[in-house]
Every structure is written in structure tokens, then in C-alpha cells.
Design a protein with these regions (language model features):
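Metal-dependent phosphoesterases centered on the DNase I-like endonuclease/exonuclease/phosphatase
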Residues: 10-15, 88-181
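Structured beta-strand-rich core segments of catalytic domains in phosphoester-bond hydrolases
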Residues: 1-76
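Acidic carboxylate-rich catalytic motifs and surrounding loops in phosphoryl-/glycosyl-chemistry enzymes
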Residues: 44-45, 151-160, 197-201
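Active-site environment of divalent metal-dependent phosphoester hydrolases
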Residues: 1-5, 77, 115-116, 160, ...
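Surface-exposed cleft-lining segments at the edges of enzyme active sites
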Residues: 45-47, 71-89, 125-129
């Protein structure tokens, strides 16, 4: 959504600060906080050409550097958008290398449009030659993690079929045909403070829900 229609006033009435980077009906990311929002950066801000799509926003909230991401979908392996997706992820890794320190408390949260491994899809056989599970995508995600990021949900839960996304079509939610593509990746100093992680399936059961379920993470305050 555009900045003009983002519900800033509604969040403010509930005691939240918010910042939003949107692009019409197609793309958008936001950060909403009760512990302050400082040092906001929209996009990569790396000195190169701006990203043509609104997919990344950074802010510091309560001493934690937070990024909200909406990683490109990729569409299909032979689509230009797939190459854009891989380049986008590599660009994010370069920003981490040049701007941030893996020792600092930092989290990159959002829709990654990648299932990290085969536990995170309902049937790997259904995804042969498909996006979201291709090896280049998973390698790009692993490169982000190799910088110093922990998948906090997967650290706590090892089993499969813990999905955050289900297609609207064909009753996929009720058939448990989903994927886990919404992630909280945190540096170790923050991941060590993780106290609870949850995918809220109940939010997916309502009338006219999103095709994604919220992924929640609780962290203790720094001592």
C-alpha cells in the first residue's frame, strides 16, 4: 500500500510507532514498535541504484537493529524475476558485510519466499524445478545465515510440517499443504535471548485471511 493509506494513526492510537515503505498494491514492508523507532533506512542505501521495488526497511528499536524484508518471489526458474531474487539476496549479504557487525543484536524478519530445507515444504516431490526450494535460492539464504544469523524458530523446533504459508487454492490449509517461508533470522547475541517462537495458525483460519500466518518471536531484554 502507499504511504497515504498506511494506518499510521491506528497504530499510534494503540501506542505504537510505525514506519512504512510501500509501493502501491504490490510491495511493502513496515516496522511497528512500542520501544521506539530510530535510524530508519529504506532499501539497501548502499550507494548503488535504488531497488525498483519496496522490499526492505531498517530501523533500530529498543537497541536492536531490525530489518523487515519481502524477498522477491522469483516466479519461475526461467523468469528474469528469479535472477532479480538471487541478486537481491546477494545485495543484502553485501550490506551486512559492509554496514553491520554480527556481534550486534540484529534481526531480519519477513517473507523470504524460500523454504530453508525439505522439512519446510509439504512434499519436496511437488517442487522439482520450482522456485522457493531451488538450490541457488537455498544457497543464497545460507549465505545470509553464514554471515552470522540464526533461524530462531528452527533452533527451537526440529520437526517438519510447521508451515507459515498455504495457497488459497484447493483447500491447501486444511490439507496441510504449506511451506515455511516466513523467517526470523537473528544474530547470536539476540537469538540467545529468544524465549518463545510461534506460528499462529489460528490467524489463518479466519474469514478472508492472508495466505500467510504470523510468525511470532519473544526475546528477553538485554541484561
Amino acid at each position: 500500500m502507499t504511504e497515504q493509506v498506511f494506518p499510521t494513526a491506528a497504530f499510534s492510537a494503540l501506542g505504537y510507532e510505525s514506519v512504512h515503505h510501500g509501493q502501491g498494491q504490490w510491495n511493502g514492508v513496515a516496522i511497528i514498535s512500542k520501544v521506539g523507532i530510530d535510524d530508519v533506512v529504506m532499501g539497501f542505501a548502499d550507494g548503488d541504484e535504488p531497488d525498483p521495488e519496496a522490499r526492505l526497511i531498517w530501523a533500530t528499536c529498543g537497541g536492536v537493529r531490525v530489518a523487515s524484508v519481502y524477498v522477491p518471489n522469483g516466479r519461475s526458474l526461467d523468469d528474469d524475476h528469479y535472477q532479480y531474487k538471487l541478486a537481491w539476496l546477494e545485495r543484502l549479504r553485501r550490506v551486512l558485510d559492509t554496514t553491520y557487525d554480527p556481534a550486534q543484536p540484529l534481526a531480519i524478519c519477513g517473507d523470504y519466499n524460500i523454504a530453508p530445507d525439505d522439512r519446510d515444504v509439504w512434499d519436496p516431490a511437488d517442487f522439482v524445478d520450482a522456485t522457493h526450494v531451488s538450490q541457488p535460492e537455498r544457497d543464497a539464504l545460507r549465505r545470509l545465515q553464514d554471515w552470522g544469523l540464526v533461524d530462531v524458530f528452527r533452533r527451537r523446533y526440529d520437526e517438519g510440517e510447521l508451515f507459515s504459508w498455504w495457497d488459497y487454492r484447493g483447500g491447501s490449509f486444511h490439507k496441510r499443504k504449506g511451506m515455511r517461508i516466513d523467517l526470523i533470522l537473528a544474530t547470536e547475541s539476540l537469538a540467545a535471548r529468544s524465549t518463545a517462537d510461534l506460528i499462529d495458525r489460528n490467524a489463518r483460519k479466519g474469514k478472508l485471511p492472508s495466505d500467510h500466518a504470523p510468525v511470532l518471536g519473544d526475546f528477553s531484554e538485554a541484561t
